[in-house]
Amino acid sequence: MGPAARPALRSPPPPPPPPPSPLLLLLPLLPLWLGLAGPGAAADGSEPAAGAGRGGARAVRVDVRLPRQDALVLEGVRIGSEADPAPLLGGRLLLMDIVDAEQEAPVEGWIAVAYVGKEQAAQFHQENKGSGPQAYPKALVQQMRRALFLGASALLLLILNHNVVRELDISQLLLRPVIVLHYSSNVTKLLDALLQRTQATAEITSGESLSANIEWKLTLWTTCGLSKDGYGGWQDLVCLGGSRAQEQKPLQQLWNAILLVAMLLCTGLVVQAQRQASRQSQRELGGQVDLFKRRVVRRLASLKTRRCRLSRAAQGLPDPGAETCAVCLDYFCNKQWLRVLPCKHEFHRDCVDPWLMLQQTCPLCKFNVLGNRYSDD
């Protein structure tokens, strides 16, 4: 009664695989932990919506003509609704400081020019010392409102220090085009000419930026708060600031590279830890299997064996009632080695030893040769 198929070795069950490391679950949160936006992100966590709502911006070109001088070409952005047409604007340029000093209404068809230099920046810091992030350069805003009151067809802003003046409250000022000029040497030349009261005229047209190295970003921050001096209309806060995109681009690339390397290192460490844990568990399991096999071999070596001794009469044709090996179903022959189990059943030694290495039980009565008990299987 040999088995149809030998089952696998009865060894201790393998330990369950180690659970996934918590670091693997935290890897998707690594960019958030390190700062997904990288350098230049908003301090309050709010996300800017560039060119949103009524604070849209488009690139403009300003051609300035001065007497007995070469024409100046300036670049900037126009603040206004994206749906509004961009008609050709032109007229005489007048500096608001001079207009305020003369206390006279300029002629029709003129363009107001307001600027913020070092003196205005120092005054702005002095006036807004200790104030919150919603403090605005009030003098500049008052100049802009006075220009609209006097009938200026457009507002031209010369902000020489973009790092100082970032936020302008221009509530109710979008009835006229507001143009912020990029800083360049031509802006300085224009400002010097206007301070000398040189008569200058300008034409403002929409167009693409002429310089690839200068970028301006108009950002609409809805979290900056409402205007303190608004007239009850649209009172969101337009934050004007040079984005310096080309300057921040290498820094952003460096930040992305550092973030990528950090994620790769963390992933490599997690994978290495998982492999070490897997190898350790395999070594432990292999050691347990080897120990179990050595125990079975020692037990088999301690079992009794004997040589089969048959009478001369039995050495001829086998008797139908003669004993057989329950493993190979063959008769016991003279001088064969037999294995005698503790349950007194005998088998061919070469047949039953491989069975005992796999099952450790008697093929007939299921007696466990290791534990000296009968198996319930």
UniProtKB/Swiss-Prot annotation:
Positions in the Extracellular compartment: 44-250
Gene Ontology biological process terms in this record: ubiquitin-dependent protein catabolic process
Record key words, sorted: Glycoprotein, Membrane, Metal-binding, Transmembrane, Transmembrane helix, Zinc, Zinc-finger
GO MF terms held by the record: ubiquitin protein ligase activity; zinc ion binding
RING-type zinc finger locations on the chain: 325-366
GO CC terms in record: cytoplasm; membrane
Keyword Hydrolase assigned: no
Top-level taxon: Eukaryota
Localization: Membrane
Bilayer-spanning residue ranges: 23-43, 251-271
Pfam families from the UniProt entry: zf-RING_2
InterPro entries reported in the protein's UniProt record: Znf_RING, Znf_RING/FYVE/PHD, ZNRF3_Arkadia_E3_ligases
Name used for this protein in its record: RING finger protein 215
Lineage: Eukaryota, Metazoa, Chordata, Craniata, Vertebrata
